[in-house]
Regions:
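Glycine-rich "HGGG/HGxG" loop immediately N-terminal to the catalytic nucleophile
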Residues: 67-81
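N-terminal cap/lid segment of alpha/beta-hydrolase-fold proteins
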Residues: 1-24
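Short, surface-exposed "cap/lid" segments of acyl-processing enzymes
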Residues: 21-59
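Hydrolases whose catalytic domains are alpha/beta-hydrolase-1, hotdog thioesterase
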Residues: 115-116
Length: 116
């Protein structure tokens, strides 16, 4: 399910998937995209991640979310490394508020993996 959450007054885009037929607390996963290598890449960062998140949720039975950091994709703001750290903290808070997972795994590619 597509949606958004706030990070430091900025609106960030996210994709959140809940496993079908799994009532109660499950593990959670947040997938973070890497650093964009130009304007086109910045608009498309994490573009295929929603499909991967849907698959993780379906196959593992976990709540799973991906989002675009500030300055990327449909998210507001401009890049800053500290901003990306703040964005991940806000994503964790959002996942907890929305789904109450039993625990959260943080994974990512490139810079997103380093921040996670």
């Amino acid at each position: 399910m597509n949606g958004s959450f706030d990070s430091g007054g900025l609106r960030l885009q996210r994709h959140l998937t809940r496993p079908a037929g799994r009532p109660g607390a499950t593990s959670g996963l947040i997938l973070c995209h890497g650093f964009p290598f130009g304007p086109i890449d910045a608009r498309q960062s994490g573009g295929t991640f929603p499909e991967l998140i849907d698959r993780v949720s379906s196959e593992l039975g976990w709540v799973a979310m991906t989002f675009t950091f500030r300055g990327c994709g449909g998210s507001e703001g401009d890049f800053s490394l500290q901003g990306w750290v703040d964005d991940l903290r806000a994503a964790i808070d959002h996942l907890i508020a929305e789904t109450s997972p039993s625990g959260i795994w943080l994974v990512g590619t490139n810079t997103g993996g380093s921040i996670a």
